[in-house]
Amino acid sequence: MELENWLLKYNVKKMTIDNYNNYIKSYKLEEPEDYAKVFKDKDITKIDIVFHSVSYVINYWYVDEYKYISAKLRLKYDGCGFAEYEAIYDMNGITEDDYFRKI
């Protein structure tokens, strides 16, 4: 399957975790109040970061077609998911955007 080849070629799991680590460092420095609300009194060493899903997406914006790969990590604490990180990659493995949200 082409998606599986793409995932192997770009090592999407490692790439997504690396991007998450960079994102979270910036988030903590640039948005300390928001960071504190999301992570509250959680012991950071006990947070499980789980590779949750990856998908090939085709979106239509007016008449334009936009194809990309979405990779998601789920953050769990005491077995419960509390946040999600999503990275968007173009078809050449370049990071286009990323999102972090509380769930």
Regions found by a protein language model. Give the residues of each.
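Exposed beta-strand-loop-beta-strand "reactive/processing" segments of non-cytosolic proteins
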Residues: 42-87
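A short, surface-exposed interaction/processing loop segment used at functional sites
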Residues: 82-103
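Generic structural hydrophobic/aromatic packing signal, biased to beta-strands
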Residues: 16, 71-73, 93
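Alpha-helical structural elements
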Residues: 1, 15-18, 30, 46, ...
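N-terminal trafficking/processing presequences and adjacent post-cleavage segments
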Residues: 1-39
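Glutamate identity and glutamate-enriched acidic tracts
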Residues: 2-4, 30-33, 65, 84-86, ...
